[in-house]
Swiss-Prot record:
The keyword NAD applies. It catalyses: nicotinate beta-D-ribonucleotide + ATP + H(+) = deamido-NAD(+) + diphosphate. The gene is nadD. Signal peptide: none annotated. This is Probable nicotinate-nucleotide adenylyltransferase. NCBIfam families: cyt_tran_rel, nicotinate (nicotinamide) nucleotide adenylyltransferase, PRK00071.1-3. SUPFAM superfamilies: Nucleotidylyl transferase. It comes from Corynebacterium kroppenstedtii (strain DSM 44385 / JCM 11950 / CIP 105744 / CCUG 35717). The lineage of its organism: Bacteria, Bacillati, Actinomycetota, Actinomycetes, Mycobacteriales. InterPro entries: Cyt_trans-like, NadD/NMNAT, Rossmann-like_a/b/a_fold.
Length: 211
């Protein structure tokens, strides 16, 4: 694997990003500031193993939306490491690959507190926790005590970000219902969703109120 530019403190924002929204971007910015990160790398999942019960937008669309959303921030970039690996995406594999690519970086894995609550079920959880500092971003109204994580609790730092009240699930539902999604996602992502007719029920042609 080709070695990339060295960043001493590298944030890893993993997620399905279906679609990416302002909550993700604000969370990444807040964590970057709090932990003095040199760069935040957004890593769209290839095939999210924990979402087999629903249809996920194709990886290339999610990658392009993430690229559009992060383009204006010089501290942000996007990695295809999970998409190009193929097969189900497991965080332990993501972190191993990124350690190869950034051998001198200290990694900070940023994810939602709701995902962290299920972390004990993730593949090779103990090994995974040794590969990065885990930062759990919470949203208002969502409570997660470290004691709920058992022995993993001491390895996770909680950060509350108000903008995380926005959810990709709600955005998909609004798009399907022909309701506006402006200001929930970056402008370029609104335009991409409309152009590619993402999230619309089968056979529906347009979503004019999205504009």
């Amino acid at each position: 694997m080709q070695t990339s530019t060295n960043y001493p403190r590298l944030g890893i924002m993993g997620g399905t990003f279906d679609p990416i929204h302002h909550g993700h971007l604000v969370a990444a910015s807040e964590v970057a500031d709090l932990f003095s990160l040199d760069r935040v790398l957004f890593v769209p999942t290839g095939q999210p193993w924990q979402k087999k019960n629903r249809t996920v937008t194709p990886a290339e669309d999610r990658y392009l939306m993430t690229t559009i959303a992060t383009a204006s921030n010089p501290r942000f970039s996007v990695s295809r490491v999970d998409i190009d690996r193929g097969g189900p995406t497991y965080t332990v594999d993501t972190l191993h690959d990124l350690h190869e690519r950034y051998p001198h970086a200290e990694l900070f894995f940023i994810t939602g507190a709701d995902a962290v609550a299920r972390m004990a079920t993730w593949r090779d959880c103990t090994e995974m926790m040794s590969l990065a500092t885990f930062v759990a971003v919470t949203r208002p109204g969502y409570s997660l005590e470290k004691t709920e994580l058992g022995p993993l609790g001491d390895s996770v730092t909680m950060v509350e970000v108000p903008a995380m009240a926005i959810s990709s699930t709600n955005i998909r539902a609004r798009a399907r219902a022909n309701r506006p999604i402006w200001y929930l996602v970056p402008d370029g992502v609104v335009q991409y969703i409309a152009k590619e007719k993402l999230y619309l029920p089968s056979g529906q042609v347009g979503a004019s109120s999205m504009w």
